Amino acid sequence: MVATKSVLSAVALAGVAAAETIDVMVGQGGLKFVPDNIKAKAGDEVVFHFVMGHHDVTLGRYDSPCMPIQGESIWSGVVDTVEKGKGVTFTVPIHDDKTKWIYCSVAKHCQNGMSLVINEPSSGDNQADYKDRAKIVPQSGSPTQVKGGTLGGSGGSGGSSSSSASSSGSSSGTTSAPTPTGGHSSSHPSSTSGSDSSNTQSTPDATLIPSGSIPSATGSGSHSSTPTASPGAAAGLKGSAVLAGVVALGAWIGLL
């Protein structure tokens, strides 16, 4: 019994070790899957790396180029590498050795040759014939839900740069505006509602003064330039001046 378990474990480990990861570049060099003809067995994974442009990975039928298989779909959804950034992947696990026809359903990409075959038959159905018949398909089709694989890589941020300006339409006077890439710099924030904060020059940080510490006005239309000293404070100042004079006189006499 123990020997049987050991044999089964060894077989299982051998199967795991034999599994391969096959990398395919999507959009590299144009409307292409690179490579576009691969072999994969049960247990392998095909990782599609979106390199450039707007593309998707769709499982289709040989007899209906550029059209998806209903009920047995593989679809990555359309990936925009311009917005999401490079590094987005779609990993498809392979469960059998059947032939699979993959294409890009975006616009006329399939019609222009953007397709791939996994486990192409040694005779009969072939990729060259698939691409020829795809040229006359009026419009490509795709599923409506991501299925058959897992999206990963760096596309989770959605492509938004953390340094991009707010789209609220108004700039805040309490935050430093970003340095503009062109045009004239401005040392004053714009007072126009809806102004773009990206057009203002970065200003030095200001120290905020509590409103209670600002001296009150001494008369209509004017503010006191200096606060009024209290009698006690004035007496203290005079005493300090007399003491300083005595110290200075003593020092002078000592020099004599």
Swiss-Prot record:
Q: Which residues form the propeptide?
A: 234-256
Descriptive protein name? Extracellular serine-rich protein ARB_03024
Signal peptide from the UniProt entry: 1-19
Superkingdom, taxonomy of origin: Eukaryota
Q: Does the keyword RNA-binding apply?
A: no
Q: Does the keyword Amino-acid biosynthesis apply?
A: no
Q: Which GO terms describe its cellular component?
A: extracellular region; plasma membrane; side of membrane
- Bias (Gly residues) occurs at 149-159
Name the UniProt key words of this record, in alphabetical order: Cell membrane, Glycoprotein, GPI-anchor, Lipoprotein, Membrane, Secreted, Signal
Which organism was this protein described from?
Answer: Arthroderma benhamiae (strain ATCC MYA-4681 / CBS 112371) (Trichophyton mentagrophytes)
Kindly give the InterPro entries that the UniProt entry links to this protein: Cupredoxin, Ser-rich/MCO-related
